[in-house]
Amino acid sequence: MSIRKLSQLLALMALLAVPFALTSCDDDWYYDDYWNGYYPDNDNNGSEADQMVAVLSGRWQGDMVYTYTDDNAKPGEKKRVSEKYAVEMTFYRSENAKDRYAGQGVEVDRNDQGDTQALNFTWWIDTRNGDIYIKYTDSNTIFRMDAASTDYGYHLGWETSRNAYTFFGYLVGQSNDDEIYIDLERVETPRKAKAATETTPLGAQSFGSTVDRWTPTWTLTSSKGFHRR
């Protein structure tokens, strides 16, 4: 082969390689190390996980009780503080088929003083057991919702008594002792989730093992501002 033809062939091969180089540069999801490191089989999943995502995806409204250890407590004293907010949480599913059991979200809190805060988060489902994880973007704090626990678990799905899809239960901090309790009702399905609901009928499905709502047995703290999350 002549030098000229070889140069032309190499140039053509380089040109053909450009699209592959571009398409291989997709941003990795925030949780890739956590996801693949702890759950290597999460790509092998069934239709139940798809149904969970279809139910979870959407806009939810309700109440949140956030419990944490008071940073301003006296030395040696561990004082637990519980604050209640009106909350709206919107879950968007990933449009990437590889990450179809995960997504992003926005949370808007309002306290009894009328103050509001908006928080971005990412979420994913452990398809082996149905646990839901939420990671707040600003603090990188991860909370887990345990699908198997009857005391600190969750319910996600249709609730006949309310004639609505509801989502209530505990989020437990994985790197601190913070706890969040939510009691939400779905008010809207975003367009990103509609395609999934068309192919995955929601019906009267429910997930998680919690069936009873939590009732506070003490007076909630009147919140001034918001504890960092």
Regions found by a protein language model. Name each.
Residues 55-61, 98-104, 127-134, 162-170:
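Short, hydrophobic/aromatic-rich segments at coil-to-beta transitions
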Residues 72-129:
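N-terminal glycine/threonine-rich, aromatic-flanked beta-hairpin/loop signature
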Residues 227-229:
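Short, solvent-exposed mixed-charge patches
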